[in-house]
Design a protein with these regions (language model features):
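N-terminal periplasmic accessory domains that precede
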Residues: 34, 67-70, 90-93, 105, ...
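Short, acidic, small-residue-rich periplasmic hinge/interaction motif at the N-terminus
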Residues: 17-60, 99
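Outer-membrane beta-barrel translocator/channel fold
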Residues: 235-271, 275
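Transmembrane beta-barrel wall of Gram-negative outer-membrane proteins
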Residues: 166-168, 172-204, 209-246, 282-285, ...
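Short acidic/polar hinge/loop motifs at secondary-structure boundaries
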Residues: 110-138, 157, 263
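Conserved small/polar residues in nucleotide/adenosyl-binding loops
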Residues: 315-321
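Extracytoplasmic beta-strand/coil segments of soluble accessory domains associated
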Residues: 68-110
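Flexible, solvent-exposed coil segments and beta strand-coil junctions
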Residues: 158-166, 195-204, 264-275
Length: 322
């Protein structure tokens, strides 16, 4: 079991351009976003290549596949899927840089693994359903995480507070017995400024590759408090993946004759004859995240923001060779 605690404290100043016409009086209205990620986001005049993706654009493709697969149509992006169906273990490369050089942040907090700096999207199934918007920066970007963002940056912002209450039930069915069920709700913003929302998801798939099955569960719970000067956002989210291992690959001869062959779990007798496959050659992994964001507007030109993050990881493996 592994625990990771992150503290992020920032203070941002907004310069106000003086008007040449001093006879004109303008009333400035400043609206704070649900979570301030301005330090990580590129603007129109920022000298870098980037793409902004809205919630509406994500929803058009969000039928159960992992987030990297939803971004596969963006320039310079190549995605992979161990199971071949876009569900389970997936990866992303941007301009040739692998996932260890693609910095991922959720509400401004780094999501990449602290040791390998890889990103395991399988541990956040259906997370796209709780993303309000994202920005992909190609090449060295604005990330505050230094060299980790050498190849690219993916900045995710989770759902904003919904003004109206709602309840949603969504299901999708696809090839290879792929099935996704999602339940979402929101209480709407109350008169006192509070809002609570959540999501439960379940995704299952047999995969294109032999025995590359996935059984994924996820949750997302969020509470917000909004006033003119104060924004508080507390959320917890996580996932549980049970996936049959399918990352070993095959030689060119096997690929030509049987593209879907999966050598994981092979069992041989004393003479070297293949007897079958181990049924429980799976990854059993849980990942939970808790975030707290507080933002206080000090004046029209300054605001103070605080971010806290707690991560809990639990991995269980019962592979045949262990």
């Amino acid at each position: 079991m592994k625990y990771i605690i992150t503290l992020m404290l920032g203070c941002s100043l907004m310069a106000q351009q003086a008007k040449s016409d001093i006879d004109t009086l303008t009333v400035n209205t400043v609206t704070l976003e649900s979570v301030t990620v301005s330090a990580l986001r590129a603007k129109e005049n920022t000298p870098m290549a980037f793409t902004n993706i809205s919630k509406e654009e994500l929803e058009k493709q969000n039928l159960g596949k992992d987030l990297p697969v939803l971004l596969r149509f963006l320039p310079n992006v190549v995605t992979t899927s161990d199971a071949g169906a876009g569900v389970g273990y997936t990866g992303i490369r941007v301009r040739g840089s692998d996932a260890t050089r693609v910095n991922v942040t959720i509400n401004g907090i780094a999501y990449n693994d602290a040791e390998s700096h890889n990103t395991f999207w399988v541990d956040l199934p259906d997370f796209a359903s709780s993303v309000d918007n994202l920005q992909l920066q190609r090449g060295v970007g604005t990330s505050t995480n230094g060299a980790a963002a050498f190849g690219a940056s993916i900045n995710l912002e989770t759902d904003k507070a919904s003004e109206k209450s709602y309840a949603q039930l969504a299901s999708s069915v696809g090839s290879f017995s792929t099935l996704k069920n999602t339940i979402k709700f929101s209480t709407g913003i109350s008169e006192s400024g509070f809002e609570f929302s959540g999501r439960l998801s379940n995704i299952s798939s047999d995969g294109y590759v032999d025995r590359a099955s996935s059984n994924l569960k996820a949750y997302f719970l969020q509470g917000t408090y909004n006033t003119n000067n104060t924004k508080i956002k507390a959320l917890t989210f996580g996932g549980h993946e049970l996936t049959y291992q399918a990352w070993y690959g095959v030689d060119p001869a096997t690929l030509a004759s049987k593209r879907t062959y999966n050598p994981a779990g092979e069992q041989y007798d004393e003479d070297g004859n293949l007897q079958g496959y181990y049924d429980n050659q799976v990854d059993n992994y849980k990942q939970d995240h808790t975030q707290l964001h507080i933002e206080q507007r000090l004046s029209n030109n300054a605001r103070l923001s605080l971010g806290l993050n707690y991560t809990c990881l639990l991995y269980t493996s019962d592979a045949a060779d262990e």
